[in-house]
């Protein structure tokens, strides 16, 4: 552990601003094979595991800045998720700059791919954590 006196901090939830929270939450749950979104106040929550929830919220006319969300998945989960990406006819890239269209990367002996959600956020699935990340 590089910081022996550091506190243990876990991400619990984050808000994902969306053009249409229903479309975005349904898209995410569908592509990732997760349970249907659950309403919570003004949000639609999708539980992604590890006690983390993505809380989708309508941006209500505010400009949405693209965010990047990376998910570490098993080889089997990668195949399932990537299969759904291709079934939906989504564009995908090997890089975050979206220059290597239609390719996957093989960083650190794993596989990784980027694709966008309906609001333009860049989603990434990887099978190995990036060293130094």
Where are these regions (language model features)?
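N-terminal beta-strand motif that seeds the catalytic metal site of vicinal oxygen chelate
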Residues: 2-22, 69, 128-133
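Short glycine-enriched loop/turn motifs at secondary-structure junctions
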Residues: 8-10, 62-66, 106-107
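Core segments of cupin and vicinal oxygen chelate
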Residues: 8-9, 15-54, 58-60
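Short aromatic/hydrophobic contact patches that present stacked aromatics
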Residues: 13-15, 45, 68-70, 112-114
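Exposed loop/turn and edge beta-strand positions of beta-sandwich/beta-sheet ligand-binding modules
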Residues: 40, 67, 109
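Short, charged/polar surface micro-motifs in flexible loops or helix N-caps
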Residues: 50-53, 62-63, 74-79
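Conserved beta-strand in the GNAT
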Residues: 54-57, 114, 123-126
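Vicinal oxygen chelate
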Residues: 71-118, 122, 130-133
């Amino acid at each position: 552990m590089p910081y022996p006196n550091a506190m243990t901090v876990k991400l619990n939830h984050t808000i994902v601003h969306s053009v249409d929270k229903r479309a975005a939450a349904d898209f995410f749950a569908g592509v990732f094979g997760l349970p249907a979104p659950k309403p919570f106040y003004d949000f639609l929550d999708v539980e992604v595991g590890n006690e983390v929830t993505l809380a989708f919220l309508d941006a209500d006319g505010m400009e949405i800045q693209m965010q990047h969300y990376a998910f570490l998945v098993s080889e089997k989960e990668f195949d399932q998720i990537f299969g759904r990406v291709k079934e939906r006819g989504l564009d995908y890239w090997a890089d975050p700059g979206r220059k290597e269209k239609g390719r996957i990367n093989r960083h650190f002996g794993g596989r990784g791919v980027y694709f966008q959600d309906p609001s333009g956020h860049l989603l990434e699935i990887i099978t190995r954590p990036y060293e130094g990340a």
